[in-house]
Each structure stands twice: as structure tokens, then as C-alpha cells.
Amino acid sequence: MWAIIGIPVTVLLILYRCKPSIFSTMSEHTLDWVRDKAIGWSHTPPRNKIDTHHHCVPSFYAKAVEEQGGDPSGWPTPHWSPLASKLLMKRVGVETAVLSVTAPGACIMPSRSERAQLARKLNEYSAELRDKDPESFAFFVSLPSILDTEDALAEIAYGLDTLHADGVTLFTRYGSTNTYLGHADVEPIWAELDRRGCVVFIHPTHPVDTNPVNSKLPQPSIDYPHETTRTAMDMITNKTRLKYPRCKVILSHAGGALPYIISRVTTPMSKAPDFAVSHRMGITHDQAMESFRSFHFDLALSSSPQVLDMLLRMVPHDHILYGSDFPYAPITAYPAFLEALESYEMDPELREMINFGNAMKLFPRLSTPRGGSL
């Protein structure tokens, strides 16, 4: 309808981001349409992908975050609806999106009971979406703070046994200090997830220090990848991956800086006796590399040629997954990273593995025929 009155949709999108009050009377469907039309899509690829990094932002969750002062990272909570997800999925060629709630999640709430209540509400909402359209949506369980151990274990059981979720989301860090995922306090959570052979999606959250480098660099753009690196190295050096090998662990954003950093830690280890390295680092060189290669890596905001070059050299090809990071990325990121992935030279079999084949192995429910040959 806006094209009729001659207003370019790109101008409307800028107005929406800068002056959202202008659109206060506009329906969600129209907002989603404006955003979709404003993106510079070059083409529509086949719909065969499984998007393992795709967020839902129900209105009650967005309200809860804003009532607590907003996302501590400083990143604005985006407009989202199921329709917005489906429009994006069509554009990037996604058949099924595995929904998750990103940080801060239920941890935004100040009290233990409120965290548990919000996590339960998020999970029941996600399950309802999945039940209405199981071909389009799957979901990861949202948890209260995993430092509220009993509450987190109860929600794992409810989410997996009652709601039949496809996995569980963990954030990179919990509490007011650096309790990363290799910490002893997290062991009961890992033990239960390992007992179940669970798929675990690790998403970064803000570091303790929320001050950005400068006003031009939103914290998630550079600090989130480093938080993923910190928690992964914490898990490696504390042998979390070796102790709980039945968990299939997905690292967001191609593992952050981990593929680049791992050799900085492990190369010196390769020249020292195992007993000396183990005494100093808690793990040998071979154990560290085994742990590193055990992770799965999604390509959300990470399909540029330089990242793909490194990832394909360093990790098993059947551990690389497609991801979009919708709706939290800048609006131009989706066509840009899609084009980068599609223009990267690889054989058709590998492309199908990344787009959907590897995810089908993690999520048996999604193992249905798709637009490729796998």
C-alpha cells in the first residue's frame, strides 16, 4: 500500500528504526512486509535449509526485557512475529527454523521465581508455535539461570519430556561473575544433558563489563564472539567436553574467535611432555584438539570467505550448520551473508551438508526429504 503513495520502502525502514512512534498504528503484518521489501534480495534460493540459529521474540518477552531496563548488552530488542520469521525463511531458503530465545532470556528477571516463570512461558509459547506448524518450526528449551540448579533441571525435564523440544539453549556465562560453562557449578546441568544425549545450543551473552569499545561498536558485534571463545576454552581446559561427550554442542557464530585462537593455546602444548602440559593446563594437546573438534559450529553472521576458509580447514565438515541470527542482525546482514555463502566455491555434497544434512543428523524429527539429494 505504501508503494501506491510513492514512499520508497527503504525510507520507511529508516523511519521505522529511527522514529518507531510514526508506525504505532501500523499492523504487525504491514511492519513485517515493509521490512521484507526493504532488504536488497538478489534472488530466492531453494527452500531446503535448516536454520539452527533463529530467534523468537514474543511480545511478553520483549516487554519483560524493557521493564528490566533493556538488554544489558545495549542491543535493542527487535520487532518480531511468526510471520516475520516465515518471510525471512522464504527469502533465505529455510524450510525449518529451530527457534531459540537469545540472551538475556529468562535471566533478565530479578528473582528466582520470576526467572522460572518466564522460562516456562517462553517454552510453552515455542511449543505452541511448533505444534501449529511442525514443518516450519522446531525449538530449543529456554532455561532460568542454570545457577538456580533445581529450577534449571526441572525446566530441562519439562521442556524435553513434556514439550518434546529439540534441544536446550545455554548462555556463555551466568551470574554476576564469570561463571562460564566449564565451571564446577554447572556440572549438574551437563550431567543431566549428557544423560539425555541432548543437543545444546550455546549462545553468547554480555560480559561482566558491559562498556562498549566505543559508540560505533555495539557490544554484541565484537564482545559476543569473544564470550563464546571464553566459554569454549573454559569447557576445553576443564575437560567438560571429555566428561560429557554425549552432548552435541553447537557454538554460535562459527565458534566466535575459537578457530583462530585454539592454535595459539595448543601449538606450544604439542612440544611439551603430556604430564607437564596436563599439570599446567589440566589437559593434553590431543585432548584439547579432540574437545575443539567435538563442537558443532553454526554460520550465523559468519559465512564470509575468510571465516569459511578457516572453518573448513579446522573442523569436521559434518559439524558445520546453517544459521541466520534472525531477527537480531542488521537488516542488510541477511542478504549479504546469504550471498557470501552461496558464492563460496564448494562441491554440491558439502553445500547440502551445511544447508541441511548435518542438522538432520542432530535433529531426527527433521530428517525428511528436502530440495537436495541427501
Model-derived features: where do they sit?
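Active-site gating loops and adjacent loop-to-helix segments of metal-dependent hydrolytic enzymes
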Residues: 44-46, 55-80, 109-110, 116, ...
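Conserved N-terminal glycine/acidic-rich loop preference
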Residues: 199-202, 226-237, 241, 257-281, ...
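Active-site gating/metal-coordination segments in enzymes
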Residues: 95, 101-238
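Active-site environment of divalent metal-dependent phosphoester hydrolases
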Residues: 57-60, 105-107, 146-147, 176, ...
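Hydrophobic faces of well-ordered beta-strands that scaffold small-molecule active sites
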Residues: 50-54, 97-99, 139-141, 168-170, ...
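Mid-to-C-terminal alpha-helical segments outside catalytic/metal-binding sites
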Residues: 2-48, 57-96, 124-131, 154, ...
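Active-site-adjacent C-terminal substructures of enzyme catalytic domains
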Residues: 225, 246, 277-331
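Active-site core of metal-dependent hydrolases
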Residues: 217-229, 242-243, 249-253, 259, ...
